[in-house]
Amino acid sequence: MVTIHNLGFPRIGRHRELKFALEKYWSNAISQDELLQTASTLCKQYWQNQNKLDWVPVGDFSFYDHVLDMSFLLGNIPKRAENLSDNELDNYFRVARGRAFINESERTCIQAGEMTKWFDTNYHYIVPEFSQETNFALQAQRLIAQIRQAQAQGVKVKPVVIGPVTYLWLGKSKDKINKLDLLDSLVKVYTQLFDELVKLGIEWIQVDEPILVTELETDWQVAFRKAYDILANSPIKLLLVSYFGTLQDNLSFACGLPIDGLHIDAINAKDEVQLLIDSLSDDKILSLGVVNGRNIWKTDLSTTLLWLEPIHQQLQNRLWLAPSCSLLHVPVDLDSEQELNDDIKSWLGFAVQKLEELSLLAQALNQGQASVTKEIANNIDAINSKKYSPLVHNAKVKERIAKVNDELGNRQSDYKSRTKLQSEKFNLPLYPTTTIGSFPQTLEIRQARHDYKLGKLSAEQYMQTMRSEIRYCVQVQEHLGLDVLVHGEPERNDMVEYFGQQLSGYVFSQFGWVQSYGSRCVKPPIIFGDIFRPKPMTLDWITYAQSLTNKPMKGMITGPVTMLNWSFVRDDQPRATTCLQLSLAIRDEVLDLEKSNINIIQIDEAALREGLPLRKSQWQTYLDWAIRAYRVSANGVSDETQIHTHMCYSEFNDIIEAIAQMDADVITIETSRSDMELLDIFDEFDYPNEIGPGVYDIHSPNIPSVDSIVELMQKAAKYIPIKRLWVNPDCGLKTRHWDEVNLALTNMVLASQQLRKN
């Protein structure tokens, strides 16, 4: 009999119930008990959704981030937060979000933990912090409470934890300690945890070690053997879980670890399955991730079964089936969608549907395909409908793609020639100030957008409301003394969705939300077909904003690589081809802005780095087509037009040469959480163009002081000539409140003025 299980379920709720509860709690609108009740209700719903599974993951729920949960479970709490008097949950949120100075009686100020991408996804985790003083201590109360709640509901529980080697690999040393020196003390705490789980009657534990799909150095492979030789002494059965790629050179040693089962991502590592079967001993389970946990397309059940049947014959009861990875990365339930085109909806599957597919696969293997004849036939119809649909294919787009050449990606002159012309045109001071694009999305803005969608506001009324917001943004920026302005993006719900809604080849869900970090959710658009731009997308808003000021106004566009990486992407052609289609559509927009005298244009590539394959040996192929797509989108303009790009959360040191090849006149980057550490690369690499290192963390409510900004920029000036430095926040300001924005930007402008005097 085939066993089916899941690796993780979306946390946020069908209608983002967790998001709204968190934000109410943070604003003191509900009590902690009410927040905990929301979490309890959601967990019960999740477990009910998974009631056909043989093993259900528990411990995958999180109030903010599962890596931060692991840090607290292991007692690895940053010293700046460990001695606060409030309860554990509030301390947890302070590490995640930071805490500003409030008043004289409550002086505690906490810096937020550093946040970075979870492997190559659009999820962000709070980076564990290590030092010579790190002392692990088991604090498993929250996990144990979840397990007991699930057991009381009759759930067959499989707890989920991040494995010890991956946990160390994900973290950052604060004093240059070798992270692997902490392995022995860390494994002791895992042993204690497993002992506690045995007392709860737990048979299997899921231990996530996704770094198995990366290129591990020998010392990390040795660490695996060392850790699992100890953990194998526990009576609990260990399911070692990898995902997001292939094992390759880690396959042999992973199969030889003293574990009871191994899960692989069979979507990406299908070619390794037979070698795994041959390499695993006969007493070990092989779990195959056969349903894609990263995308929203239906599984081709017929083709999958054809492949699985001989494997089932070989493995029999040793075969487990699961999604390729946690379903954290897909929306909750397709049945919530009532407005999607019927054909397109028939091609999709969200988390609930993926578990149904898993159940059908198991039934077909265990009871024969005759038991699911109707379901298989319906699935075949949907797969064929997508393959041949005229909604998907556009001959004109394919013809334009065929004509793309390298010349399209080249500027007329090099940066040194361009910057002279741009300096004369804009006449900006040293340390010019700007923001990244968005300003606070107030309740009034969201309400207007909502009413417009429902038809309660006419197009004219909506336009006037948005223009009023733009006017206010421009007035605020002029009053603050910023040098290069933005229109504030009140008309944009999301930087990808806004553009996708205006491009053919995209479709949008109502409730297709996924978690990005904490309470921040995104609704990735769905690329189902060939992409083109029917008409200008930003022109009216930007030109209106420019009419309100004599200062330069930045045009704001999301770049092709970010559009791709933050969308659910069609799976019937190479991603590089889809990205090039996007770049041509964006190029048309850039040229229209320039024709309308918008001569500073920012093309955001916030997600460039997250598209990198997890194995460095595969990076160059990705970077070649990604940088080409960016250059095609940006480089049709004249030398006087200044092109900016922005990258948030991008640890770009190892791709700095590729970023330089983008040839943007100005790049703005996230650096404040890392204390300008990201700029170390410029000791070795002479970056030729202009840079705006972010001077404060917009994800935290903390207000930066003038002195802190001056200090950060002085650090930056050690690496970059001051004539090529800009002053800006880390990222857009849409999630902040106006009072925070005004205070922070006031200090930023004052700091810039002080720097000019020096």
From Swiss-Prot:
<keyword id="KW-0808">Transferase</keyword>
<feature type="binding site">
    <location>
        <position position="566"/>
    </location>
    <ligand>
        <name>5-methyltetrahydropteroyltri-L-glutamate</name>
    </ligand>
</feature>
<dbReference type="GO" id="GO:0003871">
    <property type="term" value="F:5-methyltetrahydropteroyltriglutamate-homocysteine S-methyltransferase activity"/>
</dbReference>
<comment type="function">
    <text>Catalyzes the transfer of a methyl group from 5-methyltetrahydrofolate to homocysteine resulting in methionine formation.</text>
</comment>
<dbReference type="InterPro" id="IPR038071">
    <property type="entry name" value="UROD/MetE-like_sf"/>
</dbReference>
<feature type="binding site">
    <location>
        <position position="610"/>
    </location>
    <ligand>
        <name>5-methyltetrahydropteroyltri-L-glutamate</name>
    </ligand>
</feature>
<keyword id="KW-0489">Methyltransferase</keyword>
<dbReference type="GO" id="GO:0009086">
    <property type="term" value="P:methionine biosynthetic process"/>
</dbReference>
<feature type="binding site">
    <location>
        <begin position="436"/>
        <end position="438"/>
    </location>
    <ligand>
        <name>L-homocysteine</name>
    </ligand>
</feature>
<dbReference type="InterPro" id="IPR013215">
    <property type="entry name" value="Cbl-indep_Met_Synth_N"/>
</dbReference>
<feature type="binding site">
    <location>
        <position position="117"/>
    </location>
    <ligand>
        <name>5-methyltetrahydropteroyltri-L-glutamate</name>
    </ligand>
</feature>
<dbReference type="GO" id="GO:0032259">
    <property type="term" value="P:methylation"/>
</dbReference>
<keyword id="KW-0677">Repeat</keyword>
<feature type="binding site">
    <location>
        <begin position="16"/>
        <end position="19"/>
    </location>
    <ligand>
        <name>5-methyltetrahydropteroyltri-L-glutamate</name>
    </ligand>
</feature>
<feature type="binding site">
    <location>
        <position position="489"/>
    </location>
    <ligand>
        <name>L-homocysteine</name>
    </ligand>
</feature>
<feature type="binding site">
    <location>
        <position position="670"/>
    </location>
    <ligand>
        <name>Zn(2+)</name>
    </ligand>
</feature>
<feature type="binding site">
    <location>
        <position position="731"/>
    </location>
    <ligand>
        <name>Zn(2+)</name>
    </ligand>
</feature>
<feature type="active site" description="Proton donor">
    <location>
        <position position="699"/>
    </location>
</feature>
<comment type="pathway">
    <text>Amino-acid biosynthesis; L-methionine biosynthesis via de novo pathway; L-methionine from L-homocysteine (MetE route): step 1/1.</text>
</comment>
<feature type="binding site">
    <location>
        <position position="604"/>
    </location>
    <ligand>
        <name>L-methionine</name>
    </ligand>
</feature>
<dbReference type="Pfam" id="PF08267">
    <property type="entry name" value="Meth_synt_1"/>
</dbReference>
<protein>
    <recommendedName>
        <fullName>5-methyltetrahydropteroyltriglutamate--homocysteine methyltransferase</fullName>
        <ecNumber>2.1.1.14</ecNumber>
    </recommendedName>
</protein>
<dbReference type="GO" id="GO:0008270">
    <property type="term" value="F:zinc ion binding"/>
</dbReference>
<feature type="binding site">
    <location>
        <position position="646"/>
    </location>
    <ligand>
        <name>Zn(2+)</name>
    </ligand>
</feature>
<comment type="similarity">
    <text>Belongs to the vitamin-B12 independent methionine synthase family.</text>
</comment>
<keyword id="KW-0862">Zinc</keyword>
<feature type="binding site">
    <location>
        <position position="648"/>
    </location>
    <ligand>
        <name>Zn(2+)</name>
    </ligand>
</feature>
<keyword id="KW-0028">Amino-acid biosynthesis</keyword>
<feature type="binding site">
    <location>
        <position position="489"/>
    </location>
    <ligand>
        <name>L-methionine</name>
    </ligand>
</feature>
<dbReference type="Pfam" id="PF01717">
    <property type="entry name" value="Meth_synt_2"/>
</dbReference>
<keyword id="KW-0486">Methionine biosynthesis</keyword>
<feature type="binding site">
    <location>
        <position position="604"/>
    </location>
    <ligand>
        <name>L-homocysteine</name>
    </ligand>
</feature>
<feature type="binding site">
    <location>
        <begin position="520"/>
        <end position="521"/>
    </location>
    <ligand>
        <name>5-methyltetrahydropteroyltri-L-glutamate</name>
    </ligand>
</feature>
<keyword id="KW-0479">Metal-binding</keyword>
<dbReference type="InterPro" id="IPR006276">
    <property type="entry name" value="Cobalamin-indep_Met_synthase"/>
</dbReference>
<feature type="binding site">
    <location>
        <begin position="436"/>
        <end position="438"/>
    </location>
    <ligand>
        <name>L-methionine</name>
    </ligand>
</feature>
<dbReference type="InterPro" id="IPR002629">
    <property type="entry name" value="Met_Synth_C/arc"/>
</dbReference>
